[in-house]
Amino acid sequence: MNRILFESCEVSNGRAVFGGARAEHVLNVLHGEVGQTLRTGVVDGLAGTSVIEAIEPLPADPATGLAQGRITVECRHDEPSPAPWADLILAPPRPRAMKRLLPQIAQMGVGRIVLVGAEKVEKAFWGAQLLKESVYRPLLLDGLMQAGVTAMPTIRQERSLRRYVEQGRMDEDFPDAACRVVAHPGAAAASAPSHGTGRVLVAIGPEGGWTDGEVALLESHGFSRLSLGPRILRTDTAVVALLARLMPIL
């Protein structure tokens, strides 16, 4: 964790009280003590620092022996956090891979994620526990705290890529995309397109890849092909590699 984040409901009168994994990190990694300053922020809000006012010791974790506690801090949040620079249309991989991927997506600066059904997406995915906000939100939060930013990605579902595109919902969701890129092995494009200061919309297919028809559909709606080389990559690898290639240098 490079920044401890609080939900807005956790901050009252300029103070926050927290325990769990965040307190465990402060006590065991940062060796927190009263008077120490921490990098903190509020989810979807401002960033800044907080000063530890009190530490209530709790019994150590019996499995790991790590110190536990409840920590009270005085918050000083007055800094804007970097805004997301990319949005993602993702044909989801299996839940286990998706669980690994979500923190990385949050770290990389993605603002909106639309999970779409494609021909090679396993139908069973749509019943996965991972699609519940109570399950995926902590994974995204973990990525934000690692990156030290506050903007929480949003996730929505579209069971059919074709209907999502042809019925105009994609254009309604992303009317201001500076460029649109679809990842596809063997594509002719050798370099990443420029997107200036605008947000980029990236479409990444399932582990079996987009079908030719799906690629053609996306191309007909303004997407340019971009290849990461001849190798077939797992979805979690492809997402991180493509975002890193497109990421603006600030």
What residues fall within each predicted segment?
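Hydrophobic side chains in well-ordered alpha-helices
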Residues: 26, 98-101, 214
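Active-site/ligand-binding-proximal alpha/beta "capping" segment
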Residues: 175-215, 223-227
